[in-house]
């Protein structure tokens, strides 16, 4: 289901719940602590142009080509922004997976007139999956995949309260443990990786809440989240295995490192929120 469809459904539901809320007193207060949660859809940004980059000389720059003994590009067939379904680009690739996101949260708001400001702490899980595949002329495939194990966020909130509803903007820091994996059809070389990564990033967006009762609110929230994996890149190192010394991965320095070209793991999140207020 597309983000626009989720947004429309959520907005319609919120409007339905908001009708009785708007009939409440204009003096409805939002100040105080709250606990709650959210559930929604996480959709990844378009990464069709992503590729795999290589370091054949060991300088850490990942700016080399993997060439055959005849100086031809061993990865001339190209790349795709997904998981391969065959050994050639023409076989196609599976689209990256969008999935559910669910979180628990706690926060505190302060109200001054119609202005409400505060903070929210949030933690949860995300079922999205992001892959990129490189195709070699052997032909073989090399697929790098990442998923979020869990994420934590600390965000500020600033909003405007009116007749039982709160409209707000939010933004702050985000942290995630990212699970990485590697698959290949190459059974000749050896492959080792540096495992999972822990990435910092940021998140921002906005939303609306309506009070259905004095101590209970329901809302709709959109967030754009970016985790930057650049400081803790997932790297796959290619070794000799049983390959000949003329193997393209081995010609320059006896081995090659590979990683994905885009270290940013970005997504759009839209979800329903609920909170118990004290």
Where in the sequence are the language-model features?
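Gram-negative outer-membrane beta-barrel domains
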Residues: 2-7, 16-278
């Amino acid at each position: 289901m597309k983000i626009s469809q989720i947004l429309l459904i959520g907005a319609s539901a919120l409007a339905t719940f908001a009708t009785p809320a708007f009939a409440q007193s204009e003096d409805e207060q939002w100040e105080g602590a709250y606990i709650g949660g959210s559930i929604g859809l996480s959709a990844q940004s378009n990464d069709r142009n992503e590729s795999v980059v290589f370091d054949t000389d060991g300088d850490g720059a990942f700016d080399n080509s993997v060439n055959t003994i005849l100086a031809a590009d061993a990865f001339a067939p190209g790349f795709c922004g997904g998981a391969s379904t065959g050994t050639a680009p023409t076989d196609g690739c599976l689209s990256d997976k969008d999935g559910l996101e669910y979180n628990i949260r706690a926060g505190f708001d302060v109200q001054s007139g119609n202005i409400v400001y505060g903070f929210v702490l949030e933690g949860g899980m995300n079922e999205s999956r992001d892959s990129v595949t490189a195709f070699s002329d052997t032909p073989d495939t090399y697929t790098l995949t990442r998923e979020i194990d869990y994420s934590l966020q600390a965000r500020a909130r600033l909003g405007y309260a009116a007749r039982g509803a709160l409209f707000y903007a939010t933004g702050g820091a985000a942290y995630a443990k990212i699970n990485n994996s590697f698959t290949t059809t190459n059974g000749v070389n050896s492959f080792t990786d540096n495992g999972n990564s822990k990435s910092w990033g940021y998140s921002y967006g906005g939303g609306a809440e309506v009070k259905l009762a004095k101590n209970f609110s329901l809302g709709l929230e959109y967030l754009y989240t970016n985790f930057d994996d650049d400081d803790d890149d997932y790297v796959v190192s290619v070794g000799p295995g049983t390959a000949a010394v003329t193997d393209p991965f081995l010609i320059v320095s006896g081995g090659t490192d590979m990683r994905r070209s885009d270290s940013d793991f970005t997504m759009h999140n839209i979800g329903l929120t609920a909170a118990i207020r004290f």
